[in-house]
Amino acid sequence: TRSEAVSGLGDVYKRQGWLEVGGSPYLASLRMNQSNSWEEFREACNFSNIPGENMVWADREGNIGWQSVGIAPIRNTHSGLVPVMGDGNYEWEGYLPIIEKPNIFNPENEFFATANQNVTPSSYDKWNAIGFSWSDPYRGNRVNQVLEKGSNLTMDDMISLQVDYLSIPSIQIIEMANNLELIEPYKFYLQKLKFWNN
C-alpha cells in the first residue's frame, strides 16, 4: 500500500488519490476554459484529478452538458466506505478514467441542475467511484422546480433563483403538522407556522 503513516495512531495508513504525482486540477480548468466542443470539454475533465465535483458545460449554440469529475480508485475487493486492512488484499487497481464517470449532454428537458445533491443516474454501476453521501436534495429539487416552469426565464429570474430561500422541508412539515390533532399551546405554534412564508 503506497500511503503515508498517520502520526500517533500506530500502524494506520491513509491514501488520497488526488495527491498522486501528476495531478493537475488547475491545468484541467485551463483546458476546460479553452474547450471549443463538448468532446474537448470532456477530454479536459479527464485531467481533473481532484475529489469529486460536478462540471457543467454550455456553448453559444445552446448545447449544455454535465460531467462528473474527480479521481476515483478502482476497488475490486471493497467499496472504500470503511477502513480496510493494509495487508495487500485491498490494493487499488488503478483509477477509473474520469471520462467513464456519469455525464449528460443536451437532456430532453433542456436543462440540468446540480446543487451537490445526488444526480447520478440509477443505471450507473460504478457507485464506489462516485460516492455514498451527498447534500440533502432540497436545494436541487427547488432549482428543478423553478426551471421546470418554462423556457422563457430571464437573467433576472436567474438572479432571483440564486437568492431563493423557499424551504421545501418547511412545506412538508407544515402539511404533516396540519394532519395532527394538537392541544394548546401547540395549536398556537402551528398557526404561526401556517403563516410562515417558507
Region annotations inferred by a language model:
Residues R15-G80:
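Gly/Pro-rich turn-and-neighbor structural signature
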